[in-house]
């Protein structure tokens, strides 16, 4: 008859009254069916609403109370507002609700407690019965649906229908946790109400009708006497915002998955006895609190949700089987008088317990059936239910507080036990076992909940809970199934750390006498004796609890919530210790810490009762507590070995359950922790302290190679071409210098020298190398620069390399240069708005645009203007490179000063970082040498006389940068490099750099200067961005040059693919073969160009030709770019604008094949070109990983920070060996020209023999 959903009229009056689902406003004489009995359309779900608020609704409610037994309140869960939400209210119910003023929980509780078990409820009117049927069906359906909705991250633990319907604090807390809504009001209210009840009399006449209800704040049994800690009576919190419970579908729709059998129906008459027995199960058979009459009206129900009043000591009400007051459980063994003193506590506990367990999502039929069907279980559960019923008044009061909890939705109830049961509370076995094995669970739970609960619950549960355990599993009470007192928290969340969850109400724990320790009144008394709020409800052995508490006190300080699924602070905090982020029961008053805090003793989770609680709650992945904490608190009150906090392991350690199992061996199921699933809830493990942790590489965005070579044992090798020692270079000067008529210009052979006169480098042009006086001298200035090396037609045979020495100056002019976007973007945006204004006819908008345009002005670019000083040319490429480097070295050393303050319309700063690397490889690809340096160029257009501070990623500056937000240059990576052999331009304050490693300088105006340069050591094992393999193959009269280029493509994971640009590969060709590549044109000789062939593909006319005859092999074929003979290089040059090509991925290969068919008269040099030369650039400082991190402009006269642009470039030069192979057939020329090895050695070794006359030979060549 524990099933409040049972609608039989056979239920005892008391039991019937216990059915909280009875919503009828009119008491029904035939109150056999607790659901039918609704005298005043009282909400059958309001537990003891009548009892609680008999005064308020003496008439209707009294009748209803009589009609509804505490057992009648469904699982001790007075569902008023929430029940209404869950179930379609009957018109009568609504009327009653409207008619009857909502009674305060306290009132309801007080009424509930004082009233003896209410007489059987009258048979509820047909409307009530229909309503009950609908509600039960809806609840069942809703629970299943909600369970299905539970996020995968939460182990889907079926929520008992009881929990769904129970407004008990447990659901409240759970809801808050699930919803992440602070249940302070609700939890507090529940807790307070429970607190009051518990404190007022733990053994108060009112037992927790709902054994499953976990008092949100279950006072410690020890604190049976009202504890001052309870003082924190928080007004009942309004129900936390909970998703509107799915409206119960019409009875037809909601196929009653489990038709709620009337509680009385299951075992109507025995309801009270069974309740007693159940209470006896907990060891408190001696005295049973009178069950508060079920709330008769919605007001009652609502009042149930209101903050519970500290119930006056009430006569033991008929224990609600479903509710099975924890109080009764605890105090039943105690004499009723005990209950009276503890009435407040017991009431409070009862209410707490009731609400908590009531809110359990126990499926009414299953849990009820289980409880009712099994006499023992029914007895224990009944006692609990009756207690819950009595507390149902209390619970009702608490329920009033409980409004936070939305009974309707499983989601609302974030119960750990609910979670424990992956599905409907049908798995009560585990939970029931927890009740029986609370000890075991408490261990596991104890991590989360105080051991006290475990002790009392264990005793009580072992007696009755084994029996009730089976029914309870259905309940899946989050903490409701667990002794409310145990956690001392109505909605203590097994996962919630009591401290974190909510302010623990120390007094409450006292009241939290172990509800389940009915058999252990003394224990309860002991707990009360321990005024500490952490008094263990179950702590028959205070010493154990103390050790336990001490063990977890330290843990709790850190964050019990991490693993404290049950020790959630009584309050429901969004981030509660609850597995869902809040204490499962949301018992604010009960601060029983899972670690055994004063309030933890009040662990209201009924850890022992619910294997879910017994189980260690896995840390939520998203829980800050779980993630941040290095350990999980595992409370094992019964375990002697648990002398300290158990380290948080990946999954909650099964051993904890094992301990509880040992304690509650009778419930093997309890040992199974549904949350133990490591895959589901891996608890954060301790960070590796043995150095095995993954070490961060120097660069998170680059391949797993160091940014630089750590080996500095060898001195840096000098960068090539820096120091030139020689007479000068033979070059040609383009004359006249200024272009007039092309036909009049010519090349004049000269000699160029670079000398220093008065500390100023001077370029001298001489007619002859022996001349003493140059015919022209050109002192270099900082604004001079050399151009890139080019080539132009020299004569009919080929081209000449050219280079200009030029003077560069800049002008501000309207326009937008590539890369300049800021002002242009602003104007573009304005234009867009202008178009909108114009279309809309918004004259004001058009005027505004004109005003803005006038303010902004046209985009301005600083366009470089170059004036050519002279152009020189040479047929030798290396000479041109050397001359260019020498000029740049001279310019770098020229002092540059900012002579005057200028004014710019737009201030701009440009920084260019250039990597230069030279690599030598043998034909096998082995790197013989790589030398790299970095150069930073700076160009500024700034108003006034500002000072610049440039920040680069120098490892010495890591962590010491202090710059304004406008000065920061966005960077894609955090990389810090080592600078070696740093050289500065004269403008840099070198003393400041030596002191602080900061680069400060006053930039010259509009001068593109090389600000600094430094060396880096590229790592030896770094993969080159472009790899060439070239081979000469000589076979007979055929020579084949084959080259393969591999482009890894990805040099940076974060920056993405960085291509190689302007790739040129030179394969020197012997002069004797040059004619093969020459083609006569009108006025000059041209070169044979390559055919672009994709491997294995033939297109164009070649398709037709291929069908008739084999394709003629082209002299040069390439798969990418173009290759041709370039006479000025005396080489076949393969050029590709970009590798890999657009759209290609990493590790692409590109091929060149040059087939030369030689005649027998063609010479074959004894040695073909040993090296190929590769040059290319990359748009990033791929070699050094240099980054410009900030550009700070100080003492600027500008109104706004200057626009800043940073460009990165890497220049690569490779010298790669070419392998030479010979085919089987011997080349005729080579064979003919092979040196004849006469036999001097052979003849010398021959033994001298007497000459034989050739007389016997017919043919004598002599």
Swiss-Prot record:
A motif (NPF 7) lies at residues 673-675. A motif (NPF 2) lies at residues 19-21. The keyword Cytoplasm applies. A motif (NPF 1) lies at residues 3-5. One of its GO terms (biological process) is clathrin-dependent endocytosis. The keyword Repeat applies. Residues 50-60, 325-345, 417-429 have a biased composition (Acidic residues). Residues 17-36, 49-189, 225-452, 474-507, 643-709, 1226-1262 are annotated as: Disordered. InterPro entries: Adaptor_comp_med_subunit, AP2_Mu_C_sf, MHD, SHD_dom, Stonin. Residues 128-145, 384-401 have a biased composition (Polar residues). Its main location: cytoplasm. Residues 847-1108 are annotated as: Interaction with Syt. One of its GO terms (molecular function) is clathrin adaptor activity. Disulfide bonds: none annotated. Interacts with the second C2 domain of Syt. Belongs to the Stoned B family. The Asn-Pro-Phe (NPF) motifs, which are found in proteins involved in the endocytic pathway, are known to interact with the EH domain. StnA, which is involved in the same pathway, is derived from the same bicistronic transcript that encodes these two different proteins. This is Protein stoned-B. It comes from Drosophila melanogaster (Fruit fly).
């Amino acid at each position: 008859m524990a099933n409040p959903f049972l609608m039989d009229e056979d239920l005892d009056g008391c039991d019937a009254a216990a059915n909280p689902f009875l919503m009828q406003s009119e008491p029904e004489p035939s109150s056999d069916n607790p659901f039918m009995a609704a005298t005043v359309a009282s909400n059958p779900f309001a537990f003891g609403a009548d009892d609680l608020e008999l005064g308020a609704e003496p008439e209707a409610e009294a009748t209803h109370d009589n009609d509804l037994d505490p057992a009648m309140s469904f699982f001790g869960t007075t569902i008023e507002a929430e029940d209404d939400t869950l179930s379609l209210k009957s018109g009568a119910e609504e009327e009653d609700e409207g008619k009857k003023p909502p009674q305060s929980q306290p009132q309801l509780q007080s009424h509930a407690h004082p009233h003896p078990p209410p007489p059987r409820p009258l048979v509820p009117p047909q409307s009530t019965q229909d309503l009950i049927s609908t509600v039960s069906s809806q609840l069942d359906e809703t629970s299943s649906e909600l369970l299905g909705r539970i996020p995968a991250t939460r182990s889907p633990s079926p929520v008992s229908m009881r929990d769904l319907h129970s407004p008990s604090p447990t659901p409240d807390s759970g809801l808050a946790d699930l919803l992440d809504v602070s249940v302070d009001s609700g939890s507090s209210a529940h807790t307070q109400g429970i607190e009051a009840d518990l404190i007022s009399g733990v053994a108060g006449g009112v037992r927790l009708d709902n054994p499953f209800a976990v008092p949100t704040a279950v006072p410690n049994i020890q604190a049976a006497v009202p504890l001052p800690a309870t003082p924190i009576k928080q007004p009942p919190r309004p129900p936390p915002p909970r998703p509107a419970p799915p409206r119960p579908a019409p009875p037809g729709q909601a196929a009653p998955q489990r038709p709620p059998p009337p509680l009385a129906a299951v075992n109507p008459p025995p309801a009270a006895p069974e309740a007693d027995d159940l209470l006896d199960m907990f060891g408190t058979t001696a005295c049973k609190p009178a069950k508060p009459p079920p709330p008769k009206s919605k007001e009652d129900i609502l009042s149930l949700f209101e903050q519970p009043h500290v119930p006056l000591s009430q006569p033991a009400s008929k224990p609600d089987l479903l509710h099975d007051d924890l109080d009764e459980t605890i105090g039943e063994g105690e004499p009723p008088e005990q209950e009276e003193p503890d009435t407040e506590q017991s009431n409070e506990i009862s209410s707490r317990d009731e609400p908590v367990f009531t809110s359990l999502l126990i499926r009414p039929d299953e849990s009820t059936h289980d409880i009712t069907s099994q006499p023992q279980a029914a007895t224990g559960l009944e006692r609990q239910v009756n207690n819950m019923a009595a507390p149902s008044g209390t619970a009702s009061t608490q329920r009033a507080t409980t409004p936070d909890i939305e009974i309707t939705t499983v989601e609302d109830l974030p119960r750990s036990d609910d979670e424990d049961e992956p599905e409907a509370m049908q798995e009560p076995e585990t939970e029931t076992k927890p009740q029986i094995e609370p000890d075991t669970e408490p261990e596991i739970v104890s991590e989360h909940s105080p051991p006290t609960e475990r002790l009392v619950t264990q005793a009580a549960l072992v007696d009755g809970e084994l029996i009730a355990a089976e029914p309870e599993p259905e309940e899946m009470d989050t903490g409701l199934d667990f002794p409310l007192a145990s956690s001392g928290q109505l909605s203590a969340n097994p996962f919630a750390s009591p401290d974190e969850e909510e302010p623990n109400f120390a007094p409450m724990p006292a009241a939290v006498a172990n509800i389940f320790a009915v058999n252990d009144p003394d224990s309860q008394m002991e707990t009360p004796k321990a005024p500490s709020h952490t008094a263990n409800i179950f702590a028959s052995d205070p010493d154990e609890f103390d050790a336990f508490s001490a063990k977890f006190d330290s843990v709790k300080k850190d964050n019990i919530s991490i693993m404290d699924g049950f020790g959630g602070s009584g309050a429901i905090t969004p981030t509660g210790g609850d597995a869902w982020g809040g204490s499962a029961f949301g018992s604010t008053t009960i601060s029983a810490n899972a670690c055994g805090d004063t309030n933890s003793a009040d662990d209201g989770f009924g850890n022992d009762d619910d294997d879910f609680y017994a189980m260690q709650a896995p840390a939520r992945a998203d829980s800050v507590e779980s993630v941040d904490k290095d350990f999980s608190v595992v409370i094992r009150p019964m375990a002697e070995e648990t002398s300290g906090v158990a380290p948080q392991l990946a999954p909650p350690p099964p051993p904890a359950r094992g301990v509880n199992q040992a304690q509650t061996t009778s419930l093997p199921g309890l040992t199974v922790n549904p949350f133990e699933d490591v895959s589901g809830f891996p608890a954060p493990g301790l960070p590796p302290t043995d150095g095995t942790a993954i070490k961060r590489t120097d660069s998170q965005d680059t391949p797993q190679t160091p940014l630089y070579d750590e080996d500095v044992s060898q001195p840096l090798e000098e960068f090539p071409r820096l120091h030139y020692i020689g007479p000068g270079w033979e070059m040609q000067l383009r004359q006249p210098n200024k272009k007039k008529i092309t036909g009049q210009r010519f090349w004049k052979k000269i000699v160029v020298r670079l000398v220093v006169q008065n500390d100023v480098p001077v370029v001298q042009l001489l007619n002859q190398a022996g001349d003493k006086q140059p015919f022209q001298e050109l002192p270099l200035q900082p604004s001079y620069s050399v151009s890139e090396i080019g080539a132009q037609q020299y004569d009919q045979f080929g081209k000449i390399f050219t280079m200009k020495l030029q003077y560069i100056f800049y002008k501000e002019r309207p326009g937008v240069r590539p890369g300049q976007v800021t002002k242009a973007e602003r104007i573009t945006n304005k234009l867009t708005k202008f178009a909108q204004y114009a279309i809309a006819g918004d004259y004001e908008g058009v005027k505004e645009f004109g005003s803005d345009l006038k303010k902004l002005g046209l985009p301005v670019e600083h366009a470089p203007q170059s004036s050519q000083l002279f152009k020189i040319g040479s047929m030798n490429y290396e000479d041109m490179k050397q001359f260019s480097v020498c000029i740049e070295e001279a310019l770098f050393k020229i002092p540059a000063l900012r002579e005057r303050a200028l004014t710019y319309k737009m201030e701009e700063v440009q920084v260019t970082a250039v990597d230069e690397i030279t690599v030598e490889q043998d034909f096998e690809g082995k790197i013989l040498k790589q030398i790299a340096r970095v150069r930073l160029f700076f160009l500024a257009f700034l108003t006034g006389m500002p000072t610049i501070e440039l920040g680069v990623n120098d490892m010495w500056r890591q962590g010491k940068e202090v710059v304004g937000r406008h000065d920061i240059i966005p960077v894609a990576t955090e990389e810090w490099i080592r600078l070696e052999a740093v050289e500065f331009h004269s403008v840099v304050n070198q003393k400041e750099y030596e002191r602080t490693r900061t680069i400060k300088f006053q930039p010259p105006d509009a001068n593109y200067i090389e600000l600094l340069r430094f060396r880096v050591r590229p790592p030896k094992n770094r993969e080159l961005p472009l790899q060439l393999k070239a081979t000469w193959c000589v076979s007979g009269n055929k020579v084949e040059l084959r080259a393969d280029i591999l482009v890894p493509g990805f040099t940076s994971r974060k920056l993405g693919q960085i291509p190689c640009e302007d790739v040129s590969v030179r394969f020197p060709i012997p002069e004797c073969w040059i004619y093969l590549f020459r083609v006569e044109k009108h006025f000059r000789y041209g070169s044979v160009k390559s055919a672009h062939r994709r491997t294995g593909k033939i297109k164009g006319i070649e398709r037709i030709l291929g069908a008739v005859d084999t394709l003629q092999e082209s002299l040069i074929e390439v798969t990418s770019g173009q290759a041709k003979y370039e006479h000025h290089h005396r080489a076949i040059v393969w050029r590709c604008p970009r590798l890999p090509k657009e759209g290609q991925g990493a590790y692409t290969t590109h091929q060149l094949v040059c087939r030369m068919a030689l005649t027998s008269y063609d010479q074959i040099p004894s040695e073909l070109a040993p090296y190929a030369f590769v040059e290319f650039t990359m748009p990033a400082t791929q070699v050094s990983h240099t980054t410009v991190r900030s550009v700070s402009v100080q003492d600027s006269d500008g109104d706004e920070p200057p626009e800043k642009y940073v460009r990165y470039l890497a220049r690569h030069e490779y010298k790669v060996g070419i392998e030479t192979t010979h085919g089987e057939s011997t080349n005729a020329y080579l064979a003919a020209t092979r040196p004849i090895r006469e036999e001097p050695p052979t003849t010398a070794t021959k033994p001298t023999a007497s000459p034989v006359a050739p007389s016997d030979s017919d043919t004598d060549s002599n």
